[in-house]
Regions:
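Active-site segments that bind and position negatively charged phosphate/pyrophosphate groups
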Residues: 390-496
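NTP-dependent small-molecule kinase module
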Residues: 2, 22, 26, 136-187
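A glycine- and Lys/Arg-enriched "phosphate-lid" helix/loop adjacent to the NTP-binding pocket
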Residues: 95-140
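C-terminal charged capping/lid subdomain of soluble metabolic enzymes
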Residues: 375-378, 468-544
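ATP-dependent small-molecule kinase phosphotransfer cores
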Residues: 30, 34-83, 87-94, 118-119
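ATP/NTP phosphate-donor binding region
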Residues: 177-289
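Walker A/P-loop
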Residues: 17
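A glycine/threonine-rich phosphate-anchoring loop and its flanking beta-alpha core
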Residues: 305-395
Length: 544
C-alpha cells in the first residue's frame, strides 16, 4: 500500500533539502527536490531559467510539477517556498501527504545562504533586507499552512526528528524514532498507508504524553488489521491502565481479549508461557491477531516470547508502563523467559510492529521502580551520549519525555546497526553480566535496574583496573548513580556471584564477555579476563 508523502516547504535556507534528505534516510524513503525536477525538465539551471525565460516560466513549470506530485507515492519532497504562494499548489501538495512549512529567522537564513550566488530571488545589494521583504510578501501564504517547524536553533538530526513526529501527528513534545532493520525470512509482513516506514523494513518508537488513549489508531497505523487482539498484562497494570487501552482499541475496531498474569520476575517462566498458550488456544486466537504487551519489562519479555512462538509468530506491540521498560526492554526485539539456572536463557528476536511510550503512565509507578529505570538511562549515557550522562550526574532528571527519547535514541542507533546482536549490540549489556548474577543470587528480590546500577559500577571498576579508563571514572559513575537514589553496594557473596556468571547467556564458548568503559560515551567488548580481576571488581560493590 502506498504511503503518504512528507512535503517540506518554506523560505530558502530553512533546511528543506538537508532535513528532507535526513528524514528520507531515516525512513528508507526516496527523496525528491522539486527544483531538481524543474532543472531536469527545463534542461537548464534555475538561474538560467530566470535569466532567459523569466520568473513566470519558472513558476509555470513549478505549478505543473506540484500537480504531478499530488498523488501519494511515499516520497519525501522538498518544495521551494515560492511554490506555495499559489493556493492551488498548496492544495495539490497537501493532497499527496503531510505539508510542513519550515521557518527560520531572517538572520539565520542569511547566515545559511548569504554567500550562495545560485539564488536569483536574492539578487539585491542588501540581502538581509531582501529576505525580510520576501518573507513579508509570502507571510499570508506560509501562514495558511497548518503545520510549521522553526529550524533556527535545531540541529539537522533534531529537525528531522521533529518532522517525523509532525508527520506522524504527534504533539509538540512527542518523538517519532524509527528503527530500520533487514526483516528475517518468515517475519510477518505488514503494510499501512498511515505508517511512515515502508512495510517490513522496521518499526517506530512513538513517545508522547497521552499516547495510551490513541493506542488503537496507532496500532492500526502500524499495519495491523483491526480485529481480535490479545492484551497481556498483570493485575497491577490492569487496574490502572487496561480500561483506557480497551476503549482505545475498541474505538479503532479492535476486539481486545485481556490475559492477566501474576506480577513479578518469578513468573517470567516457561510455565507461565505454557499457560498463555493454553488460554490463547481456548480463545482460538488466530495468526495475524496481535499480542499487545501492556506492562513492564517482565510483561514485554514474556508476551513477546509468546508472540514469537504462538502459531510460529504473530504481530507484537509493546506498550511499556515502567521507566525501565520504556528505555530498554521494549526497544530492540529481544524477548525471553528465565530458567532456574539464569535469566533470559530461552528466547528469540521478535521485532514489534510499533512501540508506544506514554510517559503519563509513570504517574502510577512506585518511586523505587522509577529509580530503577534511571539506571538504564545512565547506562545509555555511558554507552553513547555523554551529554545525557553529565545532565543526570549534575542535575538529575529534567524533561521526562526528552530524557526517555535520549535513552531510546542511543539504543535505537545500536540496534539499527546490529539488530541480532552479532557485534556492537553487546554494548547494551554494560553492567548486565555482573547484574544478572546479583539478581540470580537475590532470588530476583533485587530489581533489575538496581542490579544494573551495581553491575555498571563493577564494570567501571574492572575497566579502571585493566587500564581501559581513567582511574577516577568509577567514582564519577558511582556518585551519579548514588545521587539518583540507586544502590552503590550490596550484601552478597562475591565468590558465589562469580560462579553464577558461568550461566550467563552473554558468554562466548567458555569465555565471559564484559562491556568495559573507555570514557563516558565510549565502551568496548573484552573477553578472557582473569577471574581474579573479576572477583576484585565484585568486591568493590560488596557491602562489608
Amino acid at each position: 500500500m502506498t504511503h503518504p508523502n512528507i512535503i517540506l516547504t518554506g523560505f530558502m535556507g530553512t533546511g528543506k533539502t538537508s532535513v528532507g534528505r535526513e528524514v528520507a534516510g531515516r525512513l528508507g524513503r526516496p527523496f525528491v527536490d522539486l527544483d531538481d525536477l524543474i532543472v531536469a525538465r527545463a534542461g537548464k539551471s534555475i538561474p538560467a531559467i530566470f535569466a532567459q525565460d523569466g520568473e513566470p516560466a519558472f513558476r509555470a513549470l513549478e505549478a505543473a510539477l506540484c500537480r504531478e506530485m499530488a498523488e501519494p507515492t511515499g516520497i519525501v519532497l522538498a518544495v521551494g517556498g515560492g511554490a506555495v504562494v499559489d493556493p492551488a499548489n498548496r492544495q495539490a501538495l497537501a493532497a499527496g501527504g503531510t505539508l510542513i512549512c519550515l521557518d527560520a529567522t531572517p538572520e539565520a537564513i542569511l547566515s545559511r545562504v548569504g554567500h550562495d550566488d545560485n539564488r536569483p530571488m536574492l539578487a539585491a545589494p542588501d540581502r538581509l533586507a531582501r529576505i525580510r521583504e520576501l518573507l513579508d510578501r509570502r507571510a499570508a501564504a506560509y501562514d495558511a499552512i497548518p503545520i510549521h517547524l522553526d529550524t533556527t536553533h535545531l540541529s539537522l538530526a533534531a529537525a528531522a526528528e521533529r518532522v517525523m513526529a509532525l508527520a506522524a501527528g504527534l504533539p509538540e513534545d512527542g518523538y517519532y524514532l524509527p528503527i530500520r532493520y533487514e526483516a528475517p525470512a518468515g517475519e510477518v509482513g505488514r503494510s499501512s498507508s498511515a505508517d511512515l516506514l515502508p512495510a517490513s523494513s522496521g518499526y517506530a518508537v512513538l513517545i508522547a504524553p497521552g499516547l495510551l488513549a490513541e493506542a488503537g489508531r496507532r496500532i492500526a497505523a502500524a499495519g495491523i488489521r483491526p480485529g481480535r487482539c490479545a492484551v497481556v498484562t498483570n493485575e497491577v497494570v490492569e487496574r490502572h491502565h487496561a480500561e483506557t487501552l480497551r476503549r482505545s482499541l475498541a474505538d479503532a475496531g479492535f476486539e481486545p481479549v485481556v490475559f492477566e498474569i501474576p506480577d513479578g520476575e518469578a513468573y517470567k517462566t516457561l510455565d507461565t508461557a505454557a499457560g498463555l498458550y493454553a488460554r490463547f488456544a481456548a480463545a482460538r486466537l488466530a495468526r495475524g491477531e496481535p499480542v499487545i504487551a501492556l506492562g513492564g519489562g517482565v510483561i514485554g519479555d514474556l508476551a513477546g516470547f509468546v508472540a514469537a512462538t504462538w502459531l510460529r509468530g504473530v504481530p507484537f506491540v509493546q506498550i511499556p508502563t515502567s521507566l525501565l521498560a520504556m528505555v530498554d526492554a521494549s526497544v530492540g526485539g529481544k524477548v525471553a523467559v528465565d530458567l532456574p539456572a539464569g535469566k533470559n536463557l530461552v528466547g528469540a528476536f521478535k521485532q514489534p510492529a510499533v512501540v508506544l511510550i506514554d510517559p503519563d503512565l509513570l504517574r502510577t509507578l512506585p518511586g523505587a521502580e522509577f529509580r530503577a529505570g534511571l539506571a538504564e538511562i545512565v547506562k545509555a549515557g555511558i554507552i553513547g551520549d555523554a551529554r545525557l550522562f553529565e545532565q543526570l550526574a549534575a542535575e538529575g532528571p529534567a524533561s521526562l519525555t526528552a530524557m526517555i527519547a535520549d535513552a531510546v535514541r542511543v539504543k535505537a542507533r545500536v540496534v539499527e546497526r546490529d539488530p541480532f546482536e552479532l557485534g556492537e549490540r553487546a554494548w547494551l549489556n554494560l553492567g548486565h553480566t555482573f547484574g544478572h548474577a546479583l539478581e540470580l543470587l537475590s532470588g530476583y528480590t533485587l530489581r533489575h535496574g538496581e542490579a544494573v546500577a551495581l553491575g555498571t559500577i563493577a564494570a567501571a571498576e574492572l575497566s579502571a583496573a585493566l587500564g581501559y579508563c581513567d582511574p577516577a571514572l568509577p567514582g564519577r559513575i558511582r556518585a551519579a548513580l548514588g545521587r539518583l537514589g540507586l544502590p552503590t553496594s550490596h550484601t552478597f557473596d562475591p565468590q558465589a556471584a562469580l560462579a553464577a556468571m558461568g550461566t550467563d547467556k552473554k558468554r562466548r564458548g567458555r569465555a565471559l564477555r564484559f562491556i568495559l568503559i573507555r570514557r563516558i560515551g565510549e565502551v568496548t567488548i573484552a573477553e578472557d579476563i582473569e577471574a581474579g580481576a573479576i572477583l576484585a571488581a565484585l568486591e568493590k560493590i560488596c557491602k562489608t
